[in-house]
Amino acid sequence: MTRSSIILGAPIQSGTHQPGCVMGPASLRTAGLIASLEALGWRIEDQGDLSIGPQEAMAHANPAVHHLAETRAWIALLAARAEAAAAQSDLPVFLGGDHSMSAGTMAGVAAHAARLGRPLFVLWLDAHPDLHSLDTTESGNLHGTPVAYACGLGDFAAYPPLAHAIDPSRLCMMGIRSVDPAEHRRILDHGIEVHDMRAIDETGVVAPLRAFIERVKAANGLLHVSFDVDFLDPGIAPAVGTTVPGGATFREAHLIMEYLCDAGVVTSLDLVELNPFLDERGRTASLICDLAASLFGRRVLDRQTRSFA
């Protein structure tokens, strides 16, 4: 039976000071994302890009916080649309946009999981844990808050009410290599599973990923994958405003996506923080499209390769 995917763009950049993420969804489409997935036999429904209207400014006790009203509106909209997309397709893909959008997408797919009576797990592929609350962020950039919000950790009275918080024990973070003190405390306090780049260097990506997937399967869970461009090493993926040296290699990233495909447990996907303004002739957008295709079933033998015989 043909599997289906809804594609939904969220050109949001209110969660960061760095302009350019607003162009992310268009860049991924231009790089051929939809054609690549259709070539793998998926039925794709591109629902275009979401938008919000003008918002009345909201103040916060933390003076660093900026664009709070816009981010709140995006979260509310994305939560509703992500819940619907998860119900209407096998593996919806949400195109960012900065990572604050995942506060909305995770809230939405968590609501969908709750309706099905199944637990939601999250694989967080990122250089950062994004575990700030509004009172702990020093930069005021709200793309650093989605995990804390989605798990109900900290004061988020200014965000939309969260109906279904994700259990922090069902998180798995990989590729982490930049953690602020407040985030570190939350990781320790809640026992969040984190595999930083040192751990990946020591064990490889498959061992922790296999163990996490076994937990998802044992619980009959749904799995949301949130993929931030800065998970990758900036040497292969320069189009991100939060580059951190020492990220995942081309092969490590493809191996993760191929392994996830083989496991058959992924039920939703974020592709976030692509900033085409910082790209080099579209190389990062093309790489992200290739990685998404690996998750959707592409293998090396699916491609035409040049023979040197």
Please provide the spans of the model-predicted regions.
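Active-site metal-binding loops of divalent metal-dependent hydrolases
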Residues: 12, 98-99, 127, 176-177, ...
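Short gly/pro-enriched beta-turn/loop segments at secondary-structure junctions
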Residues: 165-169, 187-189, 218-220
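Active-site environment of divalent metal-dependent phosphoester hydrolases
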Residues: 132, 179-181, 276-278
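An alpha-beta-alpha
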Residues: 165, 169-181
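Short, glycine/polar-rich helix-capping loops at beta-to-alpha or helix-loop-helix junctions
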Residues: 179-189
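Active-site histidine-anchored catalytic micro-motif
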Residues: 91-160, 170, 263
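Catalytic cores of soluble, metal-dependent hydrolases
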Residues: 2-12, 18-93, 101, 105, ...
